[in-house]
């Protein structure tokens, strides 16, 4: 019997976002700018948090890891997409395609867990401030961050295992700008009735668990804020949560639509647009969201600029 993971297709061709040459040039300039802002913004967040003692707190530790994950997430996809905009045929071996998807899923899943951890951090800070140093000790923070990366690797392993047992013996053109699971699955000549469901269950479980943690955390946060007598205290508590809630809404909204909703509910073009949003745009927006609305980050940035340009 032929091995189940035997493939006759040796490489995949990524069709990208568009075949229009003029539009490709425009998109190249736009996405090059977005990628540059992503790298500069997230590296700035990381260096700022590491260099400023006032930002050496659990919240900013998690934010620095979120910035690192955003860099990895965007870098796993954007450079290859930019190559396609230059008019080159983007060809990836099956192994390279699987590797790209594996890396992207790892970072994407870690981001889910980090957003949940950050919600728990805000819950402890606002609802149990006297116990904050105990509940968010360096050891616990290390465990939470480590568990986020382990969870990302486990989910990525589930998706990757499903890809590796597929056979590809027909068309090799992926109608996408990266090796996304649904797009690759369409090219398989294997029975995908079960394989197509397993990753959705894995991704759906992670989304449900992390959203539950976030929802419960913010329910208690809201109750605590409403019971505050001080208007200033309420405003300060709300201001520390709005940035995180914005990031959560943007990220979870898109990944739920792509990986959990039935595929018949949207077209390939809509899938591409949503994928651009969560793989390219959101990693650029996160440092802006967290810095523009955060007084501590803005103050640390001001001091850093003064040190560099006295």
From Swiss-Prot:
* GO MF annotations, alphabetized: G protein-coupled receptor activity; olfactory receptor activity
Species the sequence originates in: Mus musculus (Mouse)
Name of this chain's protein = Olfactory receptor 5P56
Q: Where are the Cytoplasmic topological domains? A: 47-54, 121-133, 218-237, 293-310
**What Pfam family does this protein match (any one)?**
7tm_4
Q: GO CC annotation: what is one?
A: membrane
Q: Which family does it belong to?
A: Belongs to the G-protein coupled receptor 1 family.
Q: Is Membrane one of the keywords UniProt gives this record?
A: yes
Gene name of the record: Or5p56
A Gene Ontology annotation in the biological process aspect, one of them, is: sensory perception of smell
Q: Check the record and name the SUPFAM superfamilies matching this protein.
A: Family A G protein-coupled receptor-like
What highest taxon heads this organism's lineage? Eukaryota
Record: glycosylation sites:
5, 20, 265
Topology Extracellular: residue spans: 1-25, 76-99, 155-196, 259-271
Q: What disulfide bonds does the UniProt entry report for this chain?
A: 97-189
Membrane spanning stretches: 26-46, 55-75, 100-120, 134-154, 197-217, 238-258, 272-292
Where does this one sit in the cell? Cell membrane
What is the documented function of this protein?
A: Potential odorant receptor.
